[in-house]
UniProtKB/Swiss-Prot annotation:
This protein's UniProt keywords: Cytoplasm, DNA damage, DNA repair, DNA replication, DNA-binding, DNA-directed DNA polymerase, Magnesium, Metal-binding, Mutator protein, Nucleotidyltransferase, Transferase
E.C. no: 2.7.7.7
InterPro entries (alphabetical): DNA/RNA_pol_sf, DNA_pol_Y-fam_lit_finger_sf, DNA_pol_Y-fam_little_finger, DNA_polymerase-Y, DNApol_IV, IMS_HHH_1, Rev_trsase/Diguanyl_cyclase, UmuC
Site (Substrate discrimination): residue numbering on this chain: F2
Biological processes annotated in GO: DNA replication; error-prone translesion synthesis; SOS response
Cofactors that this protein relies on: Mg(2+)
Active-site residues, record numbering mapped to chain: E93
Protein name (Swiss-Prot/TrEMBL): DNA polymerase IV
Gene3D superfamilies: 3.30.70.270, 3.40.1170.60, 5' to 3' exonuclease, C-terminal subdomain, DNA polymerase, Y-family, little finger domain
Positions contributing to Mg(2+) binding: D92
Catalytic reaction annotation: DNA(n) + a 2'-deoxyribonucleoside 5'-triphosphate = DNA(n+1) + diphosphate
A single cellular component GO annotation: cytosol
Amino acid sequence: FFAAVEMRDNPALRDIPIAIGGSRERRGVISTANYPARKFGVRSAMPTGMALKLCPHLTLLPGRFDAYKEASNHIREIFSRYTSRIEPLSLDEAYLDVTDSVHCHGSATLIAQEIRQTIFNELQLTASAGIAPVKFLAKIASDMNKPNGQFVITPADVPAFLQTLPLAKIPGVGKVSAAKLEAMGLRTCGDVQKCDLVTLLKRFGKFGRILWERSQGIDERDVNSERLRKSVGVERTMAEDIHHWSECEAIIERLYPELERRLAKVKPDLLIARQGVKLKFDDFQQTTQEHVWPRLNKADLIATARKTWDERRGGRGVRLVGLHVTLLDPQ
């Protein structure tokens, strides 16, 4: 989205690899990249130095968050012409419930098509869309025909679509979970449909139920137009437990750019109420520690993590490290 705004405002950038991010000299990271840059392997959260090695002729831009926010607000206003049931996820993504919409004869497919065309007509930006009977399938569908298309999963399509859908496509299934599922012989939603729910609950806890429900096409979450994102976080579960502070610090160094990128999508000025860290130990007990802080700050997060590591670990191995921020109350 950021790259699309830059290419719109400067057409000379359209056909060349560009990325939004910090400079190599300041050990910056890539926030996002356009499709020509992605062909070279440039990705979000990648160190700028690595991106420039992959793509030496990459054009690096510092980012104009006011312009991105302005475009996002305009897009949100277009959404509101079709429904009041809008659940924003970030500057460039939202769920819309058009069940009761009278536009386009009530056709969700035609509404999505018209919204995409309106966005292009009024902002000269392309958009992709996913149409489905439940939220998680709409999210998956939205990725099927990027960067400028849409994909429809009708209620009748759901059973066949799920049979071959890789579990890694389900929101919340990361590399570690996918590997554990693979070890159980579970690769697709069709595989999980044959699995006992009790087995999943024993192996994955509450997430086991979510996994089972999604594999059946069940997602009872409504589109919440009152939704206000209260926090942003990022975490990593290690393949093997760590036992040394230097390992933990290295993980935080890798997680921080991703936290910064996610926060920038919902709060471009990076202003926050609190920030903190989470450690989960080898006995699955976990601890969090946070305190008031006005702006995202890596040095403070590292100091907080070190204090937590020293005072609460008690010699246990650490299996997960997480960083999070609590957003300011707009009221």
